[in-house]
């Protein structure tokens, strides 16, 4: 039995955009989350006609697992509020088959490579049945509340 809260307790996401089902582990530099590619899972709205998850969702699964890592650490430091993070980009993001296959329980692994103030870089992998399905390096940014407000105000005025 996991001693972690649900992913939604660490992320600012709500259904249907909350794409993770379980937090498996979080440590100083790593996190692992699970989700099943199934019509009965949180991924159901995004599956193709064959029940597969399109490969481009790999980036969001990785980003949300990074968010779980960040949210868990914030809670450990007594910071109760969930904050928004941003993906700056991804390097060498590969989903070799183009899809995350139907019926597979995905294990999303993230490992902190570098963190400097509000920037971070993570090596990420998505696996199922001991097979690596997607890999990449995801770079993130943690904006301040003021920066988020400015960004949303600019978006609302266009």
Where are these regions (language model features)?
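Short aromatic-glycine motifs in intrinsically disordered, low-complexity regions
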Residues: 2-14
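Beta-strand-rich interaction surfaces with strong enrichment in secreted/lumenal proteins
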Residues: 8, 50, 95-99
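A generic structural motif
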Residues: 24-27, 94, 114-116, 142
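HotDog/MaoC-like acyl-thioester-processing domains
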Residues: 100-107, 111-158
């Amino acid at each position: 039995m996991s001693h972690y809260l649900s992913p939604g307790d660490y992320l600012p996401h709500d259904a249907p955009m909350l794409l993770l089902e379980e937090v498996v582990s979080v440590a100083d530099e790593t996190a692992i989350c699970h989700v099943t590619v199934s019509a009965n899972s949180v991924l159901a709205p995004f599956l193709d006609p064959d029940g597969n998850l399109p490969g481009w969702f790999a980036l969001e699964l990785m980003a949300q697992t990074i968010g779980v890592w960040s949210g868990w650490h914030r809670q450990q430091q007594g910071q109760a509020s969930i904050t928004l993070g941003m993906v700056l980009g991804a390097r060498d993001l590969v989903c070799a088959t183009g899809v995350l296959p139907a019926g597979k329980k995905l294990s999303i692994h993230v490992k902190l490579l570098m963190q400097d103030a509000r920037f971070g870089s993570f090596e990420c992998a998505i696996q199922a049945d001991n097979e690596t399905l997607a890999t990449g390096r995801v770079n993130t940014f943690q904006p301040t509340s003021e920066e988020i407000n400015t960004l949303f105000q600019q978006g609302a005025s266009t």
